[in-house]
């Protein structure tokens, strides 16, 4: 779950129609997404139409001959990628952190939880709910990974290490939304029906990360997102402890640790791609950054607020949970992690991609500095249905 670069330049919007454009490095190829938020019926009631993507997206951009690379990496993935998974019997489960329903002290435990949650501020609740909703849209993310050529689960139960990883990764991630959902439900501080509607809308809307069925692009995207999610959950853990809820702090910290482990796995894949096919990989990395990393929940909607994602991400930016600075820092980290500056023997396109990537973090930071002033001037109180319509500065 992350969102901050959208506040700088990623999206432009109106009250009823979002137009998400992307500038591809493929020359004339482009991808545009039109999201229809709502329409009006004859009686003046809003009829929601799930966000739709006009099919002008680039698809199947990886040359067919590259498929053999991922086939040849199956042995490597079996030995290196699957090692990042934890056995189910040794994994934490949501009930480890929640009141025990079979215990005679269950009601007292719930009461203690609710007392702790009274100290959580409304703006913190908005960020925590947004994190949870994003985690709950997990079906979308598994679907996205299974669009990638050469690594998708072809049968639903394929024994290839790529497919085994995707299913097991999904199973580990599934606990995150479950745990945060139950905790927020028990807290009594949020409108669960509005939250549940938002989750349903979001899963129904899908996402367009502009990965083009291309595993080079897909694994660069997941590397970025997992690190961003690690940062976000780590900051919600810190804030929960500051607000006096040590249990919630432990929950968010535990989720953050999972995200970091997953980040290591995905960055390891891209590291291997840089080793065996540096030119294609660096060009793909630059392509994803030119298009900007679209956030998993960018089609978020609750049936009321057409700009819900922007408002949510603004609160997260203000609290320091996930910011435009974090976006630049993640990019810098990946450039260094994959030794982009030290690549040699590249094509002319690869050299241009290398130069672009090495200079981009500084450019983003300058944009972020300019945007900060405009954001402060434009801030206003926004009602959030997740907290019964109470207003939060966004």
Curated annotation (Swiss-Prot):
Keywords: Chloroplast, Fatty acid biosynthesis, Fatty acid metabolism, Iron, Lipid biosynthesis, Lipid metabolism, Metal-binding, Oxidoreductase, Plastid, Transit peptide. Its cofactor is Fe(2+). It catalyses: octadecanoyl-[ACP] + 2 reduced [2Fe-2S]-[ferredoxin] + O2 + 2 H(+) = (9Z)-octadecenoyl-[ACP] + 2 oxidized [2Fe-2S]-[ferredoxin] + 2 H2O. It is found in: Plastid, Chloroplast. Residues 1-37 form a transit peptide. Fe cation 2 binds at residues 173, 226, 259, 262. The keyword Chloroplast applies. It comes from the Eukaryota. GO terms for cellular component: chloroplast. One of its GO terms (biological process) is fatty acid biosynthetic process. GO terms for molecular function: metal ion binding; stearoyl-[ACP] desaturase activity. This is Stearoyl-[acyl-carrier-protein] 9-desaturase 1, chloroplastic. It comes from Arabidopsis thaliana (Mouse-ear cress). The lineage of its organism: Eukaryota, Viridiplantae, Streptophyta, Embryophyta, Tracheophyta.
């Amino acid at each position: 779950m992350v969102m901050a670069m959208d506040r700088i330049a990623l999206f432009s919007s109106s009250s009823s129609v979002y137009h998400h454009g992307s500038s591809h490095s493929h020359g004339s190829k482009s991808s545009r997404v039109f999201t229809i938020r709502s329409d009006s019926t004859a009686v003046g009631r809003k009829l929601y139409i799930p966000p739709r993507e006009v099919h002008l997206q680039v698809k199947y951009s990886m040359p067919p001959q590259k498929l053999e690379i991922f086939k040849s990496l199956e042995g490597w993935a079996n030995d290196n990628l699957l090692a990042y998974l934890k056995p189910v019997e040794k994994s934490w489960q949501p009930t480890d952190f929640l009141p025990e329903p079979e215990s005679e002290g269950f009601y007292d435990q719930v009461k203690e939880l609710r007392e702790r949650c009274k100290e959580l501020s409304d703006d913190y609740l908005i960020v925590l709910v947004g994190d949870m909703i994003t985690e709950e849209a997990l079906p979308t993310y598994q679907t996205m990974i299974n669009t990638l050529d050469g690594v998708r689960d072809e049968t639903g139960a394929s024994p290839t290490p790529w497919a085994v990883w995707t299913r097991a990764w999904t199973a580990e991630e599934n606990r995150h939304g479950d745990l945060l959902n139950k905790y927020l439900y028990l807290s009594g501080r949020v409108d669960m029906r509005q939250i549940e509607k938002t989750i349903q809308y979001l899963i129904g809307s899908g996402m367009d990360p502009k990965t083009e069925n291309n595993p080079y692009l897909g694994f660069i995207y997941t590397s970025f997102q997992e690190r961003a999610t690690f940062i976000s959950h780590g900051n919600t853990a810190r804030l929960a402890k500051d607000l006096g809820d040590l249990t919630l702090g432990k929950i968010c910290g535990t989720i953050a640790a999972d995200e970091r482990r997953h980040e290591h796995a995905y960055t390891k894949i891209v590291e291997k791609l840089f080793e065996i096919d540096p030119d294609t990989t660096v060009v793909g990395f630059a392509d994803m950054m030119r298009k900007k990393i679209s956030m998993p929940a960018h089609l978020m909607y609750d049936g009321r607020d057409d700009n819900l994602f922007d408002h949510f991400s603004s609160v997260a930016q203000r609290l320091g949970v996930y910011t435009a600075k974090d976006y630049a820092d993640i990019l810098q980290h990946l450039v260094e992690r994959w030794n982009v500056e030290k690549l040699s023997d590249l094509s002319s396109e690869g050299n241009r991609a290398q130069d672009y990537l090495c200079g981009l973090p500084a450019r983003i930071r300058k944009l972020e500095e300019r945007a900060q002033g405009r954001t402060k001037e434009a801030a206003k109180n926004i009602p959030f249905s997740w907290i019964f319509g109470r207003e939060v500065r966004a």
